[in-house]
């Protein structure tokens, strides 16, 4: 029996010498929330990240996910397995922010990723599908998007400073190894092989 897929709290914490502050690095399928003055870092290919914060308190967080490959006919079906996983990935982050003291009416988002990086996916480009999902989700949930850098053909390194809302994005036009591609392909295979964990609460 397949194990359910769950979003994981990132545990890779380190001191970033460039920004002279604590940092949390998140990988595919992970998220991180904080009320501290730290930077959250990730590298995106076809995956997307939502950087969401309470603009008043500075409580914020980031996730890193992609939609499982599903039936192309289900692309806009909100209860398809693919959309259910995306909804789950977003709600895990938002619910954790609310638990930490963020107020829903103060939430704002910046969204990144969805590059045309992974090959071998059918129908719509997986990066475009991920980008379209996160835009629609935030629109449906009335969370204002105040910045975005989506699609294109390049991976991105994203630095998010929740306390201030600042985001720095570096497009990686030259890759020195295939670590990013390997991570995303492995994540995509896990998603395809496993069911989504838990029930999704739509609110």
From Swiss-Prot:
CDD domains: CheD. Its EC number is 3.5.1.44. Transmembrane segments: none annotated. InterPro entries: CheD-like_sf, Chemorcpt_Glu_NH3ase_CheD, Cytotoxic_necrot_fac-like_cat. Keywords: Chemotaxis, Hydrolase. It comes from the Bacteria. The keyword Hydrolase applies. It is an enzyme of class 3 (hydrolase). Gene3D superfamilies: 3.30.1330.200. GO terms for biological process: chemotaxis. GO terms for molecular function: protein-glutamine glutaminase activity. It catalyses: L-glutaminyl-[protein] + H2O = L-glutamyl-[protein] + NH4(+). PANTHER family: CHEMORECEPTOR GLUTAMINE DEAMIDASE CHED-RELATED (PTHR35147:SF2). Belongs to the CheD family. HAMAP family: CheD (MF_01440). Probably deamidates glutamine residues to glutamate on methyl-accepting chemotaxis receptors (MCPs), playing an important role in chemotaxis. This is Probable chemoreceptor glutamine deamidase CheD. The lineage of its organism: Bacteria, Pseudomonadati, Pseudomonadota, Betaproteobacteria, Nitrosomonadales.
């Amino acid at each position: 029996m397949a194990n359910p897929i769950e979003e994981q709290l990132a545990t890779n914490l380190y001191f970033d010498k460039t920004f002279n502050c604590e940092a949390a690095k998140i990988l595919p399928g992970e998220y991180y929330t904080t009320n501290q003055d730290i930077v959250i870092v990730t590298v995106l290919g076809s995956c997307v990240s939502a950087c969401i914060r309470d603009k008043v308190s500075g409580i914020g967080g980031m996730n890193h996910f992609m939609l499982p490959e599903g039936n192309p006919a289900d692309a806009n079906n909100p209860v398809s397995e693919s959309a259910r996983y995306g909804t789950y990935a977003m709600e895990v982050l938002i619910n954790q922010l609310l638990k930490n003291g963020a107020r829903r009416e103060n939430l704002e988002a910046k969204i990144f990723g969805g590059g045309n990086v992974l090959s071998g996916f059918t129908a719509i480009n997986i990066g475009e599908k991920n980008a379209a999902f996160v835009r629609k989700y935030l629109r449906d949930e009335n969370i204002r998007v105040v910045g975005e850098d989506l699609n294109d053909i390049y991976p991105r390194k994203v630095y998010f400073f929740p306390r201030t809302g600042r985001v720095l994005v570096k497009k990686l036009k030259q890759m020195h190894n295939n670590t990013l591609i390997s991570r995303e392909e492995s994540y995509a295979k896990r998603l395809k092989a496993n069911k989504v964990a838990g029930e999704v609460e739509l609110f």
